[in-house]
């Protein structure tokens, strides 16, 4: 077993990896005239549609030097406010979706009740509705001409064209991410461990923190990462409910669009590069989480195999690392 919790079979088990049905063997059996065009096509598509545009964003942002880049990002008060607002709206929306996602996943996987299937369908509704339509729904509900707008306005509460509206719209469009990651995991886990914890005297909170949460942690973190990435880049719904007021309700995506409309290309590319950087950080975090989850799962399977006698301990190399 390696020091970081992973394990690999030694050379004695190596022939097993070269079986006829393994992916490596199938890959080697594919003709060269099939492999090369497919690989080149995949690389070309990724390069032209992803790598080149992303690289161009950073090139355009830094084309006039780092001093101009810094000025465009942090010396413009409207841009500073857009960055600040984005860094407020995204975490708050993620926190709300974590609470909702855990509650929804728990209700769907631990209880059977009338309308359960309908609830699962409703969780996916934000994926099907256009973000612009979602924003319009909140305007019609909470705007000054909406159903609840006059009542809220008479009590000094403003939702549309203010921070609460931005959070509400962002939370809506990112609603399914956490719940959709947790539901299949919690269904697969079942309730045996939780029932055992309760039978040993644990209360509900102890059961959740010590049994349920450790089992769903990777799915929860994965959902949080996806939710945060979407929240920071949301444009359509936020555009409708924000009023597009510079220095007040503009988030970073809205600021990019406004600077571009004003022919301030260096400024728009600077803000776009910051958004892209945040997206790349999110991608790296996603890859890291997937690797950690895969290693943890593999370690558990190997340990279970050794305990069951299916894998001889001598086939586990204590020094080899992945």
Specify the residue positions occupied by each region the protein language model found.
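Membrane-interfacial helix termini and adjacent extracytoplasmic/periplasmic loops
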Residues: 21-28, 66-71, 115-116, 135-171, ...
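Transmembrane alpha-helices
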Residues: 40-45, 95, 125, 172-190, ...
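C-terminal transmembrane helix and the adjacent membrane-cytosol boundary/short C-terminal tail
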Residues: 5, 12, 37-38, 52, ...
């Amino acid at each position: 077993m390696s020091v970081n919790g992973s394990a690999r079979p030694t050379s004695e088990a190596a022939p097993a990896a070269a079986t006829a049905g393994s992916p490596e063997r199938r890959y080697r059996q594919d003709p060269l005239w099939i492999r090369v065009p497919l690989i080149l096509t995949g690389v070309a598509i990724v390069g032209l549609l992803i790598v080149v545009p992303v690289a161009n964003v950073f090139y355009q942002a830094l084309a006039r030097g780092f001093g101009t880049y810094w000025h465009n990002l942090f010396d413009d008060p409207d841009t500073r406010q857009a960055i600040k607002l984005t860094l407020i709206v995204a975490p708050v929306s993620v926190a709300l979706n974590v609470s909702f996602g855990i509650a929804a996943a728990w209700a769907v996987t631990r209880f059977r009740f009338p309308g359960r299937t309908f609830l699962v369908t409703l969780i996916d509704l934000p994926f099907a509705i256009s973000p612009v339509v979602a924003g319009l729904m909140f305007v019609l509900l909470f705007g000054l001409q909406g159903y609840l707008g006059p009542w809220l306005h008479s009590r000094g509460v403003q939702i549309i064209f203010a921070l609460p509206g931005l959070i509400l719209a962002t939370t809506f469009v990112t609603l399914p991410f956490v719940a959709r990651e947790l539901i299949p995991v919690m269904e697969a886990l079942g309730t045996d461990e939780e029932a055992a914890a309760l039978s040993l005297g644990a209360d509900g909170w102890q059961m959740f923190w010590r049994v349920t949460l450790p089992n769903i942690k990777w799915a929860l973190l994965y959902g949080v990462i996806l939710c945060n990435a979407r929240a920071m880049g949301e444009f359509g719904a936020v555009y409708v409910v924000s009023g597009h007021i510079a220095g007040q309700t503009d988030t970073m995506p809205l600021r990019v669009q406004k600077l571009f409309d004003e022919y301030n290309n260096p400024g728009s590319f600077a803000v776009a590069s910051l958004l892209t950087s945040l997206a790349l950080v999110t991608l790296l975090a996603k890859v890291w989480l997937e690797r950690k989850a895969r290693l943890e799962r593999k370690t558990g399977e190997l340990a279970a195999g050794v305990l069951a006698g299916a894998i001889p301990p001598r086939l586990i190399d204590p020094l080899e690392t992945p």
